Amino acid sequence: MAETKDVFGQEPHPVEDDLYKERTRKRRKSDRDQRFRAFPSMEQSALKEYEKLESRTRRVLSNTYQKLIQSVFLDDSIPNGVKYLINRLLALIEKPTVDPIYIALFGSTGAGKSSLINAIIQQAMFLPVSGESICTSCIVQVSSGCCVQYEAKIHLLSDQEWREELKNLTKLLHRTEELSREEADAWNRDEAVEEATWKLQMIYGNGAESKNYEELLRAKPKRKIPTSRVITLKAEEAEELSIKLDPYIRTQRRDWDGEAAEMRIWPLIKHVEVTLPKSDLIPEGVVLVDIPGTGDFNSKRDEMWKKTIDKCSVIWVISDIERVSGGQAHEDLLNESIKACQRGFCRDVALVVTKMDKLHLPEYLRERKAGNQAIQSQREAVLERNEMIKLQRTRILKEKLKRKLPADFKVLEASDLVYTVSAQEYWQQALLTEEETEIPKLREYIRKSLLDKKKRTVTKYVTEAFGLLLLTDSFNSTQNLPNEHLHMSVLRRFAEEKVELLEKAIAQCFACMEQPLQEGVRTARTSYRCILRACLVRSKGNQGFHQTLKAVCLKNGIYASRTLARIDLNEALTQPVYDQIDPVFGSIFRTGKPTGSALMPHIDAFKQSLQEKMTEIGIRSGWKYDSCKKNFLIQEISAILGGLEDHILRRKRRIYESLTASVQSDLKLCYEEAAQITGKKACERMKDAIRRGVDRQVAEGMFERAQERMQHQFQQLKTGIVEKVKGSITTMLALASSQGDGLYKELADVGSEYKEMEKLHRSLREVAENARLRKGMQEFLLRASPSKAGPPGTSL
């Protein structure tokens, strides 16, 4: 028999092969160690243990998959049960390790978002900070990865997306009549006109604002646009990439006459992704997202703005010390963040107050209420003021969250709702220590979030894999086949009864929305005129508002710019409804103790009842000899119903936004009519057209239709949940009883894989216990360590 040869026709050398395997093992270990550089040694140990568990589990699954494929490869037909196993194994093998944790830094221009990111990643001036020039409204994502260089990918609008924006920009600038000098001055001072003019000039040069849509389509941009619509920048050092990136994400003043080609492309930028090499401070798997506070005039960028907010599991509302105690912009940011908790994946909201080193000591001492201790230095004043701000803003934020969210929502239990940070002091440490700037505290939060998610994900992954291996191994067993059909019939009837009860429980849960919806609709009907007046009337009249209002109409009731507060007529009109439904909506989609209004606890109770019944039937009917089957059913029920949570979260956003989407759809013709108005007193005539259109739609039941559409969305979710549960459980029971139903096929022996998987599953408890022990040791050491003193030279 010929000896086995490798693909190059040479015999493999055992010594060289061993050396290659050893080098590969060391390289993988080194890569894993590099990935965890951002964590302290105790947390690194926990992560490595979980990583090892996951890696070994994937290897066992891959070996099992290969054996199953080989055992059925030549068969004309594959039993349904085997197909199910193969598909589930493949899905688990290809499942991502951990979905990234997106942390939004959400704030207005100048709030200090970029400075904060620079401090967190320990790269001063890496992202351009807002000075005399302001940054673009594009989203910037910063993460660390396995790359060896610093890299930035600048994603541009597609040709179709730019054409859509170009059409709206030219409509905005189109004049059909001669204007008086006063009217022309007002036109030129209109913020929307200035923005549109500037964008066209940046792309096509001076004079572009006077050309029509067709002329600009034929015009050649000042800078060549890559056909891939992606610009990739790379550099060996952070400073080098920063210099290359700066022109793309910093927009210059409107009176700037420079000719740098990079500067001229910013109106086309959709978003930017920056990847750092493996970092000592930011772990791989965390994405910091710099999100501007107002959205964008371009539909795609604005849609991405909202979707990015909704996919973030953590939102830090960034506000500097001079703006946090008032101002509509700050309130708007908080409201948008709370809505993200309702409609998106957000589980944690915190206020990050920046520039906390700013303090005028004489003024502070004059306004300071008499305290127990006299202030001796600037440092003491800053620390006292920071603590006071933290207490005040925590109380205010908690009260605001309580009005909108369920009382047991996780964010309300957070130990830190407000952070007081100073990026400048982090670098200089003239007044505050590094710890007192709270930058390390934010890094610790990031690490803890990733570590907790890794633990949950790996535990779920190993448990799910163990369930599959249990059944795969039991397929080759022929014990208790005569009684199998009876066992499954009892379980199937029980499951059908429980599904009916679950459907009723979901219906009762969603019925809780009916009363607040009705009350909200009544309030909206009586208050919509006042709301509309507040949106349409400006304190300084129509000066500078004419084309801004036209932009609102061109975008179906929404206008977002880099400098003005976001305008959303549809959201404003439906706000009275949201004020009524928000607490109940949050209660429905929360996790916690089972109540009449919470959805997930009902699904958890359904899961528990099925698992208990399986255990009961197993004990009573002899499954003690086939514990693999019982354990598989219990594990698979968890996997099936666990997957429902993602489905529910995805539908939640559509349900929540159905009110504004309905109103926007009903007012579409009204907006289109108003956008066509030109000539004398066009602004007032546009307002009248909007008022008439809204009056007409309200009289015809606009708010009632919005209510019906939301209720229809809830009904669709209920139907989807029940159908998914029925289908999955039917498939699972058919698989478990496949031997008795004639679907049995002898498979390859996976006994060794099952034994290894059993060991890995037992290891979960040991790893969790080790992690708890390390955490306790770490907390003890932190308590025992002396607190840091202030920087030298700070006391009088």
Swiss-Prot record:
<dbReference type="GO" id="GO:0005525">
    <property type="term" value="F:GTP binding"/>
</dbReference>
<dbReference type="GO" id="GO:0016607">
    <property type="term" value="C:nuclear speck"/>
</dbReference>
<dbReference type="Pfam" id="PF00350">
    <property type="entry name" value="Dynamin_N"/>
</dbReference>
<keyword id="KW-0378">Hydrolase</keyword>
<dbReference type="InterPro" id="IPR027417">
    <property type="entry name" value="P-loop_NTPase"/>
</dbReference>
<dbReference type="InterPro" id="IPR045063">
    <property type="entry name" value="Dynamin_N"/>
</dbReference>
<dbReference type="GO" id="GO:0043066">
    <property type="term" value="P:negative regulation of apoptotic process"/>
</dbReference>
<dbReference type="GO" id="GO:0003924">
    <property type="term" value="F:GTPase activity"/>
</dbReference>
<keyword id="KW-0547">Nucleotide-binding</keyword>
<dbReference type="GO" id="GO:0071222">
    <property type="term" value="P:cellular response to lipopolysaccharide"/>
</dbReference>
<dbReference type="InterPro" id="IPR053082">
    <property type="entry name" value="Nuclear_GTPase_SLIP-GC"/>
</dbReference>
<feature type="coiled-coil region">
    <location>
        <begin position="158"/>
        <end position="185"/>
    </location>
</feature>
<feature type="compositionally biased region" description="Basic and acidic residues">
    <location>
        <begin position="1"/>
        <end position="22"/>
    </location>
</feature>
<dbReference type="GO" id="GO:0005829">
    <property type="term" value="C:cytosol"/>
</dbReference>
<keyword id="KW-0342">GTP-binding</keyword>
<protein>
    <recommendedName>
        <fullName>Nuclear GTPase SLIP-GC</fullName>
        <ecNumber>3.6.1.-</ecNumber>
    </recommendedName>
</protein>
<feature type="region of interest" description="Disordered">
    <location>
        <begin position="1"/>
        <end position="35"/>
    </location>
</feature>
<feature type="binding site">
    <location>
        <begin position="107"/>
        <end position="114"/>
    </location>
    <ligand>
        <name>GTP</name>
    </ligand>
</feature>
<keyword id="KW-0539">Nucleus</keyword>
<dbReference type="GO" id="GO:0005654">
    <property type="term" value="C:nucleoplasm"/>
</dbReference>
<comment type="function">
    <text>Nuclear GTPase found in germinal center B-cells, where it may inhibit function of the activation-induced cytidine deaminase AICDA. Reduces somatic hypermutation in B-cells which may enhance genome stability.</text>
</comment>
<keyword id="KW-0175">Coiled coil</keyword>
<feature type="coiled-coil region">
    <location>
        <begin position="745"/>
        <end position="775"/>
    </location>
</feature>
<dbReference type="GO" id="GO:0033262">
    <property type="term" value="P:regulation of nuclear cell cycle DNA replication"/>
</dbReference>
